[in-house]
Amino acid sequence: MKLSELLEKYRIEEKFEVKNEKNFDTLALTQSDIRIPNCTFVDDKKYVGTLNDSVRMVLTTSEISRELDLNRVGLCIVDNPRNTYFKLHNALKDCLEYVRPTFKTKIGENTTISKWASIAENNVIIGDNVIIDDFVMVHANTTIGDNCIIRSGVKLGSVDFEFKRDGNEVFGVEHYGGLVLRNNVEIQCNTVVNRALYPWDNTTISEFTKIDANVMISHGVKIGARNMIVAGSVIGGRTLLGDDCWVGLSATLKNGISVGNGARIN
């Protein structure tokens, strides 16, 4: 994909200046751990040194552009890089080069699904020996492994809270990513686990993790194996939680932090 062509096609920016344009395949934040050639944005000088090797294009301001190495990345200079970036992300909702392909939902053997549950018709994979109780909602781009138990009222693969201010208006950001529950996960009543924002990313709950009622898990979170997460806990977006952790009653983990193996949070 070429940024100049996309900005013109979707009429996102009337005024922009491109230098040393390079092709890219997806969008990502500056420090995203991916190897896919991507376009990102930098609207603060403190992020200039955080670009990973997969970045090809950077949306940025005229002032910050002077701090970036044109030999390494291409630049697109705009007034508000953050808003331009997320408006482009939203505009690509029907772009087959960007979003995930569509397939019919697949359900494994010996799986029990309540007639009151709602399962998306497309882009869901449910393994063998799964139990899904009443009033569960499973949205597209969700994978549920074998031997999982999903109790009443759970919401899987929902859209998360991501909004941007734009003058006197506020716009929401589309979520094209997925949610993966690995084998032997149990989630109790009325918990919400949201899908990731980017099409290349998943919110992930690993093997044998048990999640209590009324827990909120945000987009892009990665939870390791054999964790126990107690009622009322909140885990902010893009947080990484290792294996064998305990997250106690009503604990809150802010977004973007990393917690090692065997941690105890109360």
What is each stretch, according to the model?
Residues F41, R100-N266:
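Structural signal for interior beta-strand "rungs" in well-ordered beta-sheet cores
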Residues M1-K104, E109-N110, N147, G153-V154, ...:
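Terminal amphipathic alpha-helical/low-complexity segments used for targeting or macromolecular assembly
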